[in-house]
Structures are given as structure tokens and as C-alpha cells.
Curated annotation (Swiss-Prot):
PANTHER family: PERIODIC TRYPTOPHAN PROTEIN 2 HOMOLOG (PTHR19858:SF0), WD40 REPEAT PROTEIN (PTHR19858). Residues 867-910 are annotated as: Disordered. This is Periodic tryptophan protein 2 homolog. InterPro entries: PWP2, Quino_amine_DH_bsu, SSU_processome_Utp12, WD40/YVTN_repeat-like_dom_sf, WD40_repeat_CS, WD40_repeat_dom_sf, WD40_rpt. Pfam families: Utp12, WD40. The keyword Transferase does not apply. Keywords: Repeat, WD repeat. One of its GO terms (biological process) is ribosomal small subunit assembly. The keyword Ribonucleoprotein does not apply. Transmembrane segments: none annotated.
């Protein structure tokens, strides 16, 4: 029983706040989502999430010129050094102050960090003190301003740095000691410095301020003209050229001349009433991208400031922009919190490469499709979104509900999704035409809180929140068939298996209903029932009560089979607004959701806590416990708040004691939740939403499960591939053995050795080196253990889903299943076979789509050719007709002329 589930992705969250960046190849966007990082591969249409365990929200990013390393800083000034290939955090160091910006040098040997009001330069990979790994060593610090610094940039030769911030002054400093300059200030702006960058292979600069003023500065020195040494201040009346003792002119001091000024806000469409929120200059194409707080982004060519493009991306404020390597794509982060969206725009073709937006309010429910390829989510904003499980991109959004969505369910065929809402309706949406084709309405206005669909797809069951009734509709006709009443309090959960419906209520009872005769068997429980679920086989029922106890009943006779006490596993934290002790607060919090695994041996539980647990059903014991997040920017992560923050006036964390008046951050004051409220704007920068789990769901393959929490939908999977995970490895298995076996055409030995190393590159080479004629022979010679391992590798890896050799791998699959199918049927994990089915369905969908497009294109070409032929034929016929008419006219004319001649001859005779 494998329980090594690891975080693989976050669905429903694409961008929260902070800086976005492109990868070195320019095809992937790295976006911060809270204390994690999501990488969106735009070329392969996939995404993944790096869980680097930051304690606070990530704000600033910088990728090394090699593309292998990433620096990420959080709200508290902690810098995380991440290796992107292994997706592992290597090192962490504290700057002890908030970081406004950080950037690698072009030669990747130094890192510049704007640490509040000073600039630090760290050398990379030179310091190992006391045999302790320390990749960054501080080389120099510049005290530049009394206000915070916001932006920084290196020159292409890595000798100069330019920085600007809230004091409206741009300063140029040297990365080393130069005789030409020390700190050179440039003051010519009306607002905060939003961006300042050097131009390509030059010391010329462009600077942009918040008020929309852009300046182009020309430097008197070129790269290579800086002289190392100690800078000395010139005396009054002296020239800018330093004289050596022998009288030779040697060093020329640096200065900048403002050669161009332009008001960027004139291109925003709203005049000077809008402010610049982000700007980025692409050095290769000399194009400046400027974003405003009204959602408009404009492109100008530098230094002429010719308007290239103007686009309104969103109605929300644009937080960040980033260019890719070639300057073709522009990544744009809009909004904050749960209302944020991420856009990748190709400005030359004026088209969206990617445009994703999460739910605007918290996600309350999620459900996998029967084949596990899609996931449906419902939120309090009344929208239902369908996400692709493999790419984590939203494919369609349904917004017909007028109130919050409480439950979503798939039909067994996976062609329709049903959603229950607080508006009192159940809506069915077709995933082929993307329309709401049926609406089920209650006979009286009430709020629906639960939903269930039978496997045949004939019945739809929903539980009311106010009138304590269960409604049964016919899915085919939409007619109300029956109303089940009997509960005396709110119905918390319902589930269906076969002809039986089980319901749990706050009246401390669970009822087993028979659909045929509408009769119910009532079983009393010790506390309020919060959730109730059938096992996949239908022979067992699990009931979660408010005291944290999961009780198991035999489905037919309702006999108590045992229980699991989860109270100690909940381990809830004390909220910053709680006025009682942590022990007293823990008594009111418990798990609220449970879900069986597809094989029925595991039970997943989560609720009013930062923790969720996996239990063994046969053993009635806990197997593993996870923490949903370590983000201390959220409330409920730390078990108890710091006593030093608790005074006679209460918790000082709830009091805004700062004197910060950041004009770039509107509504910058502390957001305090009103008494009795559960929801508030999660986009508030200083708000601390409380961590809770609203839903847990298992993928039908059994290799993934999803957790709906305050941070979105977190997907945990067994298919996360580590860099080195060998299988039955011995000392004689190495790369040379594999290469030698492939060279000798011993493909079965090579495949078994590569499977023992579990190296994806070697396995792919061995498989693709095998000729098609020998695939059946090699597949039959593989032992059953290695055949099963090969199938598992195909499911877990990305080779099968992204390969171009689809037919080749289908031949491999057919050969393995033909020779080992009977043994695998009783031996292999069901999840492996289900994963193979998903991969085949994935390729079938893409090939069918491509074939249909080609077929339609060919039909169109044939029709065009036929129409051209018919037009040409008609033209030829018209020409023939015209030729015949011309011939007739000629004959008539000739006949007429003959008559005239005969008449003339007669007259002459006469």
C-alpha cells in the first residue's frame, strides 16, 4: 500500500501576487501562488507546482542566465535558492529586511538585492566557511536612500547597476571600485521609480516613474572605458578629467544627459489620471511595455517612443509584466488574491497564448470525472469551472447560477456535469456543446447543500439546507419524482449506491432510504453527522460526526463495525482573532469531510484544520498526516500566536502600527474581519484568511487526490518523479551496460537494466531503439515484474503523453498486453491499467481532432476545386455559345452581302 503522496499541482489558482518571470527558453511562465511556485509550460500545455516550503508569500523572482537556478524572496525578506532541474530548494538566507527587487548579474557570478533602503551585492559560489555550504557571500553594500528601493538592473558587462525607489531618484553605482564613479544620482521624475534599465551593450538608460514620465539618459562612457580604482571627489573648479602626476589625462568621470522625455500616460486612454504600476524594457527589440492601474498596457519603441500597440487586458490593476527571451510574448499578472488572473499575450499577432483566471471567491467543492482526465470545481462566486487534470488549465466556465455552488457531480459517462447551488436549482451542463441543457427546480424556494447522482445517470438527488427534505428528480425528463422527509435538522450529506440512499443530518441521525418504496431505516449517532459516504463496493458506510469520530456501519443491516477517533489528529491552530486558549478553541474544530479511495482500503479526512490525514479502513488506524501549507501569511498555520504580541490591549497583530503610506498599494491598511463573518476579500494584501479544508476527493485511478482549501485545490499524486529512484539496483547495472546491450541488439537486457536504474532517458532510448519487427519478441521475453514496471513507468512519466511516436508506443502497449494481459489482470494495480486507458484516450482525442480538421480541410479544398471547375466550365460554355453566335452573325452578314451583290448585278444587266 503506497502512501507516498506528494504535492504535484495546484488547480484553481494561477496567480496571487508578486512578480512573474519567463524561463530561459522563453516557453514557460513561473508564477507565484502564495508560498509556492507554479510553472506553466506553454509549449507542451502542462503545468506543475513547486512546493519549496516558504514561510510567507513569494513576492520577487529572478532566474539565472543559465536558466538552472531561481531566486525567490518572500514578504519577510527571506531568499530561497532553488534548482529548477531537480525542483529542489538548495539554500535559504535571510536579508532581515523586506526586499524590493533582486536580480542575477549577466555573468551569473553575483546577485544584487534591494534590501529596503540599501543595495547589497552578493558573490555566488565563493564562500564555504567552517565546512558549511554557503553559496552567497556579501561583497559590498550601498546605502542609497532613506526610502525603499523598488527596482534594479545590471549593465550587460556586469560593471554598473542602476536602482530607483520611492524617493524619485535614480542612482547608478559600480559593481566594483571604479575611478569613474561612486554613486551617481539622477533626479528628474515626478513619482516613484517603477522601472529603470540599461540598454543593450551600452550604459544608456531608460527610467519610468509612477506618474507616467519616461526619460532616456545617454552616458558619456562606453563599455570598456571604466577604470578600476578608488574614486576621488573632484575639487571645486576642477575638470571632470582626473590628471595623473605626470600630467597625462587618464580617467573621465561618468555623467548622464537626458536626451528624451515622454509622458506614457497619454497613450493609456485616460490621460494623466492613471498611474503606471509596472514597466519592462526588452533590450533586444528596444520595446518598452508599460502597464497602468486601469488594466491598460501599451508598447512603445525606444528611443523614439512611437506607439506600437495599445491593449486593455483587464478591468483590474496590472501588477507585473515580463518579456520572454525573444520579445514575442508578454506575461501579465492582473489583480490580487483570488481575483487575480494570468495572461500571456503575443503582441505581433495580437492573440492570447494563455489567459487563465481562478474563482473570485473560495472553492467549496471539487470532483474528478469518471476517467480522471477532468476536474470540476464550484465556488461561492456561483461559477463552475472545468479543469484539465493533465495540464491544469481551465477549459470552460459555467456561470448560470445566481448564488454559491455547494456541490458538483459527474454523470457516469462523463459527458455532463451537475451542480447544486444556494439559489435552489440543480443545473446540468453538456461538455460537448458547453451549454446548460437542463435545470432542476425545487417545488418551494430553498437552498440546496448536497448532491448525488446514481451510476446509471437516471436519478439526481439533492438535499435541502432549510426545509430538511431530500428531492429526487429524473435526469432524463427533469420531473420531480419524490420528496423524502424525516430529518429534523439540516441535512449535511447524502450518498447513493444502487437502490439505497444514505443521508446524514445535524439531528444526530443517519437514514438509509430505499428508492423503490421511499422507506427509511434510522440509526442514531452520538453527535451531529457532518459527512456520510458509501464505500466503492457499497458494503460499508462511513459516518463522520462533530466529535471527530468516524464510525463504520455494515450497509445491509446497519451494524456497527468499528470507529476511528480523529480528534487528536486534527491538531487545529489558534486563530489570531481567538480570545480563548488553543485547547478551548480545538474543542470546537474537527474534520468535516471524508472520502474513500477507489479500492475502499483508504479513507481521506480533512476539515477545520491545516492538517489532513489518510486512514486505513481495515486496520482502523492513521497511515499518514500532511500539512496543507506552511504559509504564515495565512491565519491558522502557527499552532499558537506569539505571546510577545499579546498585550493588555489585545493581539497587536490585529493593529496596524506601521506608518507606511505606499501609493502603489491602495487600501494598504490592516483588514480586520468583522464579528460573525466568515468571508471577506481574500485579495486584501494585509488580510490573513484562515486555513480550512472544504472538500476532499479521490481520483478514480487511486493515484491522486485533491484537497479544496483556502489556497485553492491542491493535487497530491504518487506519480511525482524524483531525480533518482532505482528499482532492484545492483553494482553491475550502469549506463555502460545499457549502451553495450543496445549496441549488441539485446534489447530486453537493456530495457531491464534501464528499469532498474529508473532513468527516463535510458528507458526511452532503449524502447525507441527497438525495431518494430522485434517489439513482440522483446515484450514476450520481459519477465512479468519488469513488464508491470514498464507499464507503471509509462503511466507515471511524461514520455507517453508528450511523445510524437504515438503509433510506435501503441505497438509496445499492444505487445505487452497481448503477452502479459492475463497475468496482469489479476496482478497489476488497477490504477496502472486505468492510467494506460487515460493515455490512450488522450491520444485518441488529439488524433481524432487532428483527423477531423484534416478531413474538413480536404473537403473544403475539394469543394473549392469543384466550384472552380464548374465556374470554368460555365465560362467555357458561355465562350462556346458566344463563338457560335458570332459564327451565325458572320454567316448572316455574308448571306446579306451576297444578296446585295446579286441585286446590283441585276441592275447592271438591266
Amino acid at each position: 500500500m503506497d502512501t507516498n503522496f506528494k504535492l504535484s499541482n495546484c488547480i484553481g489558482t494561477v496567480y496571487r501576487d508578486g512578480q512573474v518571470a519567463f524561463s530561459k527558453d522563453g516557453y514557460s511562465v513561473i508564477s507565484p501562488i502564495g508560498n509556492k511556485l507554479s510553472i506553466f509550460d506553454l509549449r507542451n500545455n502542462t503545468s506543475k507546482t513547486l512546493d519549496i516550503d516558504c514561510n510567507y508569500n513569494i513576492k520577487r523572482l529572478s532566474i539565472s542566465p543559465s536558466g538552472y537556478h531561481l531566486l525567490a524572496s518572500d514578504e519577510r525578506g527571506v531568499v530561497h535558492f532553488v534548482h529548477l532541474l531537480s525542483e529542489f530548494k538548495i539554500y535559504t538566507f535571510r536579508s532581515n529586511k523586506p526586499i524590493g527587487s533582486l536580480q542575477w548579474s549577466p555573468d551569473a557570478t553575483r546577485v544584487a538585492i534591494c534590501r529596503e533602503n540599501d543595495l547589497q551585492i552578493h558573490e555566488f559560489g565563493k564562500s564555504i566557511e567552517n565546512k558549511v555550504y554557503n553559496p552567497f557571500s556579501l561583497s559590498r553594500t550601498y546605502k542609497l536612500s532613506s526610502d525603499s528601493l523598488k527596482t534594479i538592473d545590471w549593465s550587460d558587462d556586469a560593471n554598473l547597476l542602476v536602482s530607483g525607489g520611492e524617493d524619485r531618484v535614480v542612482r547608478v553605482v559600480g559593481a566594483k571600485d571604479f575611478k569613474n564613479l561612486f554613486i551617481h544620482p539622477l533626479a528628474s521624475h515626478k513619482g516613484y521609480i517603477v522601472n529603470c534599465q540599461f540598454m543593450k551593450n551600452s550604459y544608456d538608460m531608460i527610467t519610468v516613474c509612477k506618474r507616467g514620465l519616461a526619460n532616456v539618459w545617454t552616458c558619456n562612457l562606453r563599455p570598456g572605458e571604466l577604470v578600476e580604482g578608488i574614486w576621488k571627489k573632484d575639487e571645486e573648479g576642477s575638470d571632470d578629467i582626473e590628471m595623473l602626476e605626470d600630467g597625462e589625462q587618464k580617467v573621465e568621470k561618468i555623467f548622464f544627459e537626458k536626451t528624451k522625455k515622454y509622458w506614457l500616460s497619454e497613450s493609456s486612454g485616460s490621460g494623466k489620471s492613471v498611474d503606471v504600476t509596472a514597466a519592462r524594457f526588452h533590450k533586444e527589440t528596444n520595446i518598452l511595455a508599460t502597464a497602468f492601474n486601469n488594466g491598460v498596457i501599451v508598447l512603445h519603441e525606444i528611443p523614439s517612443f512611437a506607439l506600437v500597440h495599445n491593449l486593455r487586458v483587464s478591468e483590474m490593476r496590472i501588477q507585473t509584466v515580463a518579456w520572454n527571451l525573444t520579445g514575442d510574448w508578454l506575461a501579465i499578472g492582473c489583480g490580487k488574491g483570488s481575483t487575480a488572473q494570468l495572461v500571456v499575450w503575443e503582441w505581433q499577432s495580437e492573440s492570447y497564448v494563455m489567459k487563465q483566471q481562478a474563482h473570485s471567491l473560495r472553492i467549496t467543492t471539487a470532483e474528478y470525472s469518471p476517467d480522471g482526465s477532468l476536474m470540476a470545481t464550484g465556488a461561492e462566486d456561483g461559477k463552475v469551472k472545468i479543469w484539465n487534470s493533465r495540464s491544469s488549465f481551465c477549459t470552460v466556465t459555467f456561470d448560470e447560477h445566481t448564488s454559491g455552488v455547494t456541490a458538483v457531480k459527474w454523470t457516469q459517462s462523463g459527458r455532463a456535469i451537475l451542480s447544486a447551488s444556494l439559489d435552489g436549482t440543480v443545473r446540468a451542463h453538456d461538455l460537448k456543446r458547453y451549454r446548460n441543457f437542463r435545470t432542476l427546480v425545487c417545488p418551494e424556494p430553498t437552498q440546496l447543500a448536497t448532491l448525488a447522482v446514481d451510476k446509471a445517470g437516471d436519478l439526481v438527488i439533492a438535499g435541502a439546507k432549510e426545509v430538511f427534505n431530500i428531492y429526487i428528480w429524473s435526469f432524463e425528463t427533469g420531473h420531480l419524482l419524490d420528496i423524502l422527509s424525516g430529518h429534523e435538522s439540516a441535512i449535511s450529506s447524502i450518498d447513493i449506491h444502487g437502490n439505497h440512499i444514505v443521508s446524514g443530518s445535524w439531528d444526530r441521525t443517519i437514514k438509509m432510504w430505499t428508492i423503490v418504496d421511499s422507506q427509511a431505516e434510522t440509526v442514531e449517532v452520538s453527535h451531529e453527522a457532518l459527512d456520510v459516504k458509501f464505500s466503492p463496493a457499497g458494503d460499508e458506510i462511513a459516518v463522520l460526526t462533530s466529535d471527530g469520530v468516524i464510525t463504520f456501519f455494515e450497509a445491509k443491516e446497519m451494524i456497527n463495525l468499528g470507529s476511528i477517533d480523529t480528534k487528536l489528529d486534527t491538531d487545529p491552530a489558534r486563530g489570531s482573532r481567538d480570545t480563548i486558549t488553543r485547547q478551548s478553541a480545538a474543542k470546537t474544530k474537527t474534520f468535516t469531510r471524508i472520502r474513500f479511495s477507489p479500492d475502499g482500503n483508504l479513507l481521506l479526512a480533512g476539515g477545520e484544520s491545516n492538517n489532513f490525514c489518510l486512514y486505513s479502513v481495515p486496520e482502523r488506524m492513521i497511515l499518514k498526516k500532511w500539512q496543507i501549507t506552511a504559509n504564515r501569511s495565512l491565519d491558522g498555520v502557527i499552532l499558537d500566536f506569539n505571546r510577545r504580541n499579546f498585550t493588555e490591549f489585545g493581539n497587536m497583530q490585529l493593529v496596524d502600527t506601521s506608518d507606511e503610506e505606499d501609493e502603489l498599494e491602495p487600501n494598504n491598511k490592516m483588514s480586520i474581519k468583522l464579528p460573525g463573518t466568515k468571508n471577506f476579500d481574500l485579495g486584501e494584501r494585509r488580510a490573513r484568511p484562515e486555513v480550512n479544508i472544504y472538500e476532499v476527493t479521490y481520483c478514480p485511478t487511486g493515484r491522486r487526490f485533491a484537497i479544496c482549501s483556502t489556497e485553492g485545490v491542491s493535487v497530491y499524486s504518487l506519480d511525482t518523479i524524483s531525480m533518482f529512484d532505482p528499482f532492484q539496483l545492483d553494482s553491475q547495472t550502469n549506463a555502460e551496460v545499457i549502451k553495450r546491450a543496445v549496441w549488441n541488439n539485446d534489447y530486453s537486457t537493456a530495457i531491464m537494466a534501464s528499469l532498474r536504474l529508473n532513468n527516463a532517458q535510458y528507458i526511452t532510448e532503449c524502447l525507441e531503439s527497438t525495431s518494430i519487427s522485434q517489439i513482440p519478441l522483446v515484450a514476450s521475453s520481459l519477465p512479468l515484474m519488469y513488464a508491470e514496471r514498464l507499464l507503471k513507468w509509462m503511466v507515471e512519466g511524461n514520455v507517453m503523453s508528450s511523445t510524437r511516436h504515438v503509433h510506435f508506443y501503441m505497438i509496445w502497449l499492444r505487445a505487452i498486453l497481448q503477452h502479459h494481459g492475463m497475468q496482469l489482470k489479476g496482478r497489476a494495480d488497477v490504477a496502472t491499467l486505468t492510467g494506460i486507458q487515460q493515455i490512450v484516450a488522450h491520444h485518441q482525442q488529439h488524433i481524432t481532432k487532428l483527423a477531423n480538421q484534416n478531413k474538413f480541410a480536404l473537403n473544403w479544398l475539394v469543394k473549392i476545386r469543384q466550384s472552380k471547375k464548374s465556374v470554368k466550365k460555365e465560362e467555357e460554355e458561355e465562350e462556346d455559345v458566344s463563338d457560335e453566335s458570332d459564327d451565325e452573325d458572320i454567316e448572316d452578314e455574308s448571306a446579306g452581302s451576297d444578296d446585295e451583290d446579286s441585286d446590283d448585278s441585276v441592275e447592271i444587266i438591266e
